[in-house]
Curated annotation (Swiss-Prot):
It comes from the Archaea. HAMAP family: Ribosomal_uL30_A (MF_01371_A). The keyword Ribosomal protein applies. It comes from Pyrobaculum aerophilum (strain ATCC 51768 / DSM 7523 / JCM 9630 / CIP 104966 / NBRC 100827 / IM2). This is Large ribosomal subunit protein uL30. Belongs to the universal ribosomal protein uL30 family.
Amino acid sequence: MMAQQEKVVYPRYAVIRLRGIPTTPRDIAVTLDLLRLRRKFTMVVVKGSPSVMGMIQKVNDWVTWGEIDADTLAEVLRKRGRIVGDKPLTLEYLQKWGWHSFEEIALAYVAGEIDSLSCGKKMRIKEGERPPCIPYLKPFFRLHPPRGGLNSVKLHFSVGGDLGYRGPLINDLIRRML
């Protein structure tokens, strides 16, 4: 008899596209499309599984990324969350599906209790039953350009630019872009 494997909880990362569309190499464009980063200043929140980390490393010169905290994620959901039909994500909509607040679902996602923030049409959910996600939430967030501007979209964060890994400092950038 096989022993049950423990569920691996991967860290949650916010990935923001900072560079535009012209002259994007085809393989980079395909990877950005798989990550659902189709426009400049869009953000996705992903779990740091090995396959996703490989995609992020491939597009490292086009995006910035780092660990998102629950407070920032709750604020993003409140201000920039959209459901299908381009309607804003509201507290009433969350309560309809059994979530009590934006903070509750953000904490559950960052802690690894739920695997995904959004679930689409394929997942069958009965109304009143609490789903492990937000039904029909768009899987990306459209942000404003950052207040105060960017340093450089040609240099990495470690050398004074804005691209690449920035760790928990991504939360400061996200707050400037809300």
